[in-house]
Structure formats: C-alpha cells, structure tokens
Amino acid sequence: NSDVNTDPEGVYINGVSRDITFRNCKVYNIKSTCLAGHNNGDWRSAHAFLVIGDDNGTPIRNLTIEKCEIYDIHTGTSETLTIAGNVDGFTIQDCEVHDVENIGIIVAGGDNLNAGGDISVNYARNGVVRRNRVYRCSHQVSKDFWEGVYNNPAAYGAIGIYVCGGASTVIEQNIVWECDRAIGLISESDVLATKDCIVRNNFVYNNYRTGIYLGDYIGYTIGGTSGCYVVNNTLYHNNLVGGALNGSNNSANINDEKDSEGEIRLAENCTNNTIMNNLI
C-alpha cells in the first residue's frame, strides 16, 4: 500500500481470541511504501503479524507462532511481528525473521496500539521467544525511507527481538545478527516498565549497535527496565558503528568512539536487574 496513514497487515488478531497456532507459514511482501515522514503528522506503518489484546476483561491466550518464515516486510516505524496489549500466554519459536526495515519481534505494552486500555492488564506477558533466527532487521534495508524521507542519516534503530513495556517473557536460544541492535529490554512508555523478563542462552553477533540493551528509550520515556535477568548469552563483534548515547533522535556521530554503545548497554532507569555469566 502506498497511501499515507494506512496499516496493511498480513495477519491481524484482536479481541478475546485464544488457542490459535500458526505453523509452517510464510508471510512476506507486506509493505507500506508511502514516502511519509512524521513532520506533518502522516505516518508509514505495516505488520506481518499484529496481535492486540484490546479487551480489558479477557486476554488473548495460548497463541503459538512456530516454524514460520517472515521476510521482506516494510513496516515503517511499526514492527514485523507484534504482540501487544492484553495478551497472557504466547510462544514464538523456531521462526526465521529477516530482511525487514524495522523491529523484528516485539512484545509490548498497549499504550499506543490499545490506547485507553486498563493499565493493569494492557501489556503482553507470560511469553516465550525461543530458537528463532533473526537477521537483517535494519533501517539499512530501506535507506531511501530512513535517510531520505525520515532525514536520519545515522539511523540504526531497529531491534531484532524487543520487549517494550511487556513482562514475564523468556527470550532464549535465539540467534540474532546483522540487525541494528540485537535484543532490547527497553520501555518506550512512561507508565509501563519492561519487567521480570529473562534473556538467556542467546547468540548475538555482527549487529550494528549494541548486542543487548536495557533501560529507557533514551531522552524520551521513563518507564525503564526492572527485575530482568541477562544470563549465559554470547555476544561477539557487535557495536560495528557508533551508538546514540547523546539521545539526539538516534542521530549519533557514527565515527565517534565516545558515542559507542558496547556489547551490553544500560540506559536510565534500570533497577534490580541481574547481568551475569555472559561471554563477551
């Protein structure tokens, strides 16, 4: 779809859905190709999978996405596989997610997608993201959009696997490479922390910026990261370009070593997290 302010989806699930399995599917060529930035209020968005628990009383439960290949998705500022809002119990495993222009897999709060939802349940939780291969989730896939229309020449902001205001999710045994960032436990919310998650036994390598990232969406939100564990992961040869430590709209000087993010990055509002036994 080339129209502004539209949101093409490959698969859309909402309401009180439950007991759904997607297995051995291919989802590809879902694209928003409009050349709209945010300067005038227009936007570009698409999803391969969009799961929104938008009922305050009953969550979406028992959702499984496994052995699927998801690729060639132009999401704009949205995500490729999105689990958000009142979702309680899900598994994403043995999938391959690659060659997409922004975030690969996200487990999120419903602040934006389910605005007005009950804050006590408006976040995805009790999930497992396991044994997936996630690669080339990068703004470099669509430099014409990110560098041209979005006017951000140092845009390396896409994350392979991302918990953003979600909770109680295990991320394990995944391989993530050639993404802008590999794994994020971050919050783009002022009211929902990313909390009580476990990142373990993953291999992340050759990513443009940091391998594993915790804390606020720097300079924008204060939800933070709490009660999470980052253990027994292997991180190799990440941080290939400079980071965004100055918080200036991801527009770091990519040649400035002082602006480097490193293999593991902690931003503001990281509380009661444990990082141990990682091989770097």
Please provide the spans of the model-predicted regions.
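Parallel beta-helix/beta-solenoid
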Residues: 1, 8, 12, 16-17, ...
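Extracellular beta-strand/beta-solenoid scaffold signature
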Residues: 3-14, 35-56, 74-84, 101-124, ...
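Active-site lining segments of carbohydrate-active enzymes
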Residues: 71
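Leucine-rich repeat
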Residues: 125, 134-139, 164-177, 205
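Outer-membrane beta-barrel pore domains
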Residues: 196, 204, 227-229, 235-240, ...
